[in-house]
């Protein structure tokens, strides 16, 4: 695939990451403005690099023609919480939102990976407005706590 086509494919994902970061940062701001504790400590995001997408497609035998239908983490958001119990509060916030629809949840807190990895992954459908109209894309939201509070 040539670079111009990749740019066209990835642009909606870049927009989604930017929009969702603004929304989560606004949630933090709302809590703090009300002098309330925010379950969200910080948030960041990224769009997977072309080389990472190609490698994932190769490993999982995904044809490039259907990459946007099969690769659910091209757009990724990481929500950092201070405490483990905040993770579930953030997941509830995501579930109540009308601007994204949960399509899959993976609770690696209750179901710890063999590597010891703990996080809560939520795959959502998210609509972005482009020059070509509305595009619904997958965004993976990882909610985690880097604290040592795992028991």
Regions found by a protein language model. Name each.
Residues 9, 13, 17, 50, ...:
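Generic alpha-helical secondary structure
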Residues 10, 43, 80:
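Conserved phosphate/pyrophosphate-binding and hydrolysis machinery centered on Walker-type P-loop NTPases
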């Amino acid at each position: 695939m040539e670079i111009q086509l990749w740019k066209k494919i990835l642009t909606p994902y870049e927009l989604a990451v930017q929009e969702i970061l603004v929304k989560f940062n606004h949630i933090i701001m709302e809590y703090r403005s009300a002098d309330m504790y925010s379950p969200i400590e910080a948030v960041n995001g990224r769009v997977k690099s072309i080389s990472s997408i190609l490698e994932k497609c190769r490993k999982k035998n995904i044809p490039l023609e259907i990459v946007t239908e099969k690769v659910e983490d091209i757009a990724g958001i990481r929500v950092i919480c201070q405490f483990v119990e905040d993770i579930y509060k953030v997941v509830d916030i995501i579930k109540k939102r009308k601007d994204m629809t949960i399509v899959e949840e993976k609770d690696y807190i209750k179901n710890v990976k063999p590597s010891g990895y703990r996080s809560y992954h939520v795959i959502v459908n998210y609509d972005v407005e482009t020059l070509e109209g509305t595009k619904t894309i997958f965004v993976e939201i990882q909610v985690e706590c880097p604290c040592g509070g795992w028991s």
